[in-house]
Every structure is written in C-alpha cells, then in structure tokens.
C-alpha cells in the first residue's frame, strides 16, 4: 500500500491536462527510477535504490524481484546547496554552481591547493577559497544523509538482505565522492545508477538526473494497454505535440510578460 497527498497528485494531473494531454497512470518515483537503473538480478538478490534529488531523497528496497519497502527523506541536494551558501556567504545560485562544478562529498578527493573563485553576496568582491574548504562543507551533510538512509534500512529490517548493495541515482548523486563515501558508511557495494538507454542522444540521456523521466517512459512502454485512446499517446504527430507546447508557452509566458 502506497499513500500520498491527494491534493499533490491532483495538482500534477491538472498541470498535464492544461498542456492538452491526459494522464494514463500515476507511478511512484522510486518505481519509475528502478525501471531505468536497476537490473532484474539486483531486484532478485536484494538492492536498495537511493534516488537523491533536490528536495527529497527517495528510498526503495527490492528483494526476490519485488519492491518491499519505500521511504522519503527530507534531505537532498538543496540542503547541500543551502549549507554552501550559508557557510561560504555566497548567493544560492552561485552555491549550486560551485557544488556542481567543484564539489566533492569526500574532503580527501578534493585537489589540495586548488583555489576557486567564490562570488560574494551583494556588491562585495569575489574571494578565492580552496576546494577543500568547499568539500569541508559538503561532506558532513552527505554523511548525515547516508546515515539517515542506513537508519531507515535498519528500521525496515532489510539491511541484511541487500545482496547486491546500494544503487545511487538522481541529480545529486553525481557529486564526486558520493559512491566512495557511501561505501565507507554502508560497508557494502555501491554504484551510480544511470538510465539503461541506448537510443538516440544516449550520450545525453545516460545521466542519473534523468533516471525518473526515462523510467516513466520505460514503465509506460512496458505497461501499454489497448483501452487507452491511441490518438493521445505514442502516435500523435510531432507537429501536434509541439503545437500544444507552443500554445502553452504562449499562453502562460505571454501572461507573465504583460
């Protein structure tokens, strides 16, 4: 049984409907991501999927080929960014860019002696800070996150059943040192999960940031049903799809500019 806020689900459906589309199904984020990044052997032997996004970290445990436990933690990439902004006294957008470009979840992996330009708040001049200083801010928050995941696994009773270990995915999982720090904390194999996609633009799509989106496509393809109206899904001409997109942007962005 999976529970969630009805109003949140309804808001998502309304957004899709306003774009001229219909919603076939609602899929739990962890299940969608699992379609993109997990192997059937992993699900059978036992694996924990940790999807680290911006606002939340979503956990799913699979054993014997089925999902056994899910949880959502309120700590993720946005909290890391906020820590950087506060500790280094830099704007939030700059903190996000510093995290993505120079961040490391392990201080020991940050190049010693390398300095980075750090914007200041307001009209103050930018400063130069060591990359190790940035890592000093990031590591404690990521460690806290992994310890919370570990506590959730122990509470669920599935920690000892993860035969293939942990799979990290999501946009925030790409941070340098995430896998190394996770292995230190969980004491089991850890890998970065990227979508198993080999089609056009695979060099772009094979990115952990797109795990949920690609997983939704794979879920929909695998669970196609003849009772859904074909004209709306899969066979709509590109001109119709882009036409609806153009109308949506014209309507909503046009209103904002007025």
Predicted regions and their residues:
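Phosphate/pyrophosphate-binding loops at sites that engage ATP/ADP/AMP, CoA/4′-phosphopantetheine
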Residues: 146, 150-164
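Feature representing long, continuous alpha-helical segments
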Residues: 82, 132, 136, 140-147, ...
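Short hydrophobic/aromatic-enriched beta-strand-loop microsegments
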Residues: 26, 69-71, 189-194
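Nucleotide/phosphate-binding catalytic cleft detector across ATP-hydrolyzing
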Residues: 1-49, 77, 88-135, 156-159, ...
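Glycine-rich phosphate-binding loops at beta-strand->alpha-helix junctions
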Residues: 4-5, 103-106, 161-185
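Short glycine-rich, Thr/Ser-proximal phosphate-binding strand/loop in the N-terminal lobe
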Residues: 67-79
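Gly/Thr-rich phosphate-binding beta-strand-loop-beta motif of the actin/hexokinase/Hsp70
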Residues: 38-69, 84, 216
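Acidic-glycine-rich active-site phosphate/pyrophosphate-binding loop
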Residues: 52-60, 183-195
